[in-house]
């Protein structure tokens, strides 16, 4: 209930909770976020009618604040369906990562509305497959590729800082706009607030027993990226957090105690969600996602007080612990911290077929998890098809029974 003693912020959050309670129950909210990628097609169309620029992206390394500062809408184009892979394989090798083939296939066949709406596609020199795929994408749309260093040294940071400035200048010339430092700093504050809100949300799974399924948590984390109004997003997330807490207080044993699983590895979504479902259908709870859709994209913030805003943005994004980095200590640091904070019983690493950097790095992750953290580890290599669902269930059941 609202109280006269409430601060304006408390009143705002409570009103959002009340509105949410009137309109929707938690399962409906989870499903709504899960369908956000599809539901936002219409919103994207309406924004295009207002001549709002669209920037299509493929990676967590993309410095969103720069594009948002010019008033653009930023949308992820990574596809997670095998629908267009046969079309992609007419141009690309079959033994290529399904994420790359799917993304290219949707662009080539014009089946992705977000690609259709995008005025400019921005990629980064992450993995070799993506770098070459961007060259072919340039046949369909204007593509700008940022030169991402593959290390996190001081020299690499300086290069990445320069690349971010070059990207700003590209946007200014391409769209005939001026991007001010004040606009960039405003978006830094907004995106930091989004990261804090998402972190508050997924941190709920530190509770034992868990207040939600990993499948539902992933729907929010994945769907939030397709909420175009970043200023209102933190309020929506925090209203959901409050609602989950309220329901948990009434019924903390909704989900019985079970082995607590952390999922790491490649970006997952769409077809790759089958791994999460297999874990939870066979007696485990996914309580944490370390990968691109989870903690990896929210854990670090941009330093708001650094006098050099480009250096601050460069530091934040370059510190992301992706397997394209050599060496990659930040992934181990984050992984170790999450294992401790979430009281993880086992780690499941999900890698996509032909994703060489993540597949090669599984040995180092296995050693870290089993030897340094002393908990079980399992690696799963998959793609976007449904052909291995039976095998996945069998493997997960045996692994979780062992726990």
Language-model segments: residues:
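Acidic/His-rich segments in extracytoplasmic proteins that coordinate ligands and/or metal ions
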Residues: 104-172
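Redox- and metal-dependent alpha/beta enzyme cores, enriched for Fe-S-associated oxidoreductases
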Residues: 66-80, 87-88, 266-327, 331-334, ...
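Structural motif
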Residues: 54, 119-120, 346
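An N-terminal, globular interaction/scaffold subdomain
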Residues: 54-111, 126, 133
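Short, Lys/Arg-enriched N-terminal segments with co-localized hydrophobic residues
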Residues: 4-19
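A short, acidic, amphipathic alpha-helical segment used as a generic capping/interface helix at domain edges
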Residues: 107, 326-343, 361-364
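A charged, amphipathic alpha-helical module
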Residues: 18-53, 165, 169-286, 290-298, ...
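Peripheral docking tails and interdomain loops at the edges
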Residues: 22, 363-403
């Amino acid at each position: 209930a609202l109280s006269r003693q409430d601060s304006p912020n408390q009143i705002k959050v409570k009103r959002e909770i009340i509105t949410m309670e009137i309109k929707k129950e938690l399962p409906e909210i989870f499903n709504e976020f899960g369908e956000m990628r599809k539901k936002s097609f219409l919103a994207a169309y309406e924004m295009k009618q207002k001549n709002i620029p669209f920037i299509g992206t493929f990676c967590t390394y993309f410095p969103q604040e720069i594009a948002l500062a010019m008033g653009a809408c930023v949308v992820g184009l990574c596809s997670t369906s095998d629908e267009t892979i046969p079309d992609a394989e007419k141009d690309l090798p079959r033994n290529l990562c399904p994420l790359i083939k799917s993304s290219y296939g949707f662009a080539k066949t014009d089946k992705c509305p977000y690609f259709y709406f995008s005025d400019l596609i921005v990629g980064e020199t992450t993995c070799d497959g993506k770098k070459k795929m961007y060259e072919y994408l340039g046949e369909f749309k204007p593509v700008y590729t940022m030169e991402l260093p593959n290390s996190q040294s001081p020299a690499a940071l300086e290069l990445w800082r320069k690349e971010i400035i070059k990207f700003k200048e590209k946007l200014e010339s391409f769209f005939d706009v001026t991007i001010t430092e004040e606009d960039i700093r405003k978006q830094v504050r907004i995106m930091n607030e989004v990261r804090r809100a998402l972190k508050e949300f997924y941190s709920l799974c530190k509770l034992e027993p868990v207040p939600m399924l990993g499948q539902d948590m992933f729907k929010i984390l994945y769907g939030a990226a397709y909420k175009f109004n970043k200023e209102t997003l933190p309020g929506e997330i925090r209203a959901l957090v409050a609602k989950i807490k309220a329901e948990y207080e009434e019924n903390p044993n909704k989900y019985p105690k079970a082995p607590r699983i952390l999922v790491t590895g490649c970006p997952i979504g769409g077809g790759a969600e089958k791994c999460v479902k297999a874990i939870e259908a066979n007696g485990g709870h996914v309580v944490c996602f370390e990968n691109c859709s989870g903690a990896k994209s929210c854990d670090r913030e941009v330093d708001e007080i650094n006098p050099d805003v480009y250096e601050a943005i460069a530091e934040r994004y370059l510190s992301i612990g992706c397997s394209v980095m050599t060496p990659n200590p930040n992934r181990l640091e984050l992984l170790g911290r999450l294992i401790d904070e979430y009281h993880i019983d086992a780690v499941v690493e999900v890698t996509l077929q032909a994703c060489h950097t993540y597949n090669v790095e599984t040995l180092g992750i296995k050693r870290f998890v089993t030897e340094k953290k002393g908990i079980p580890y399992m690696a799963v290599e998959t793609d976007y098809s449904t052909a291995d669902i039976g095998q996945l269930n069998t493997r997960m059941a045996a692994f979780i029974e062992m726990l």
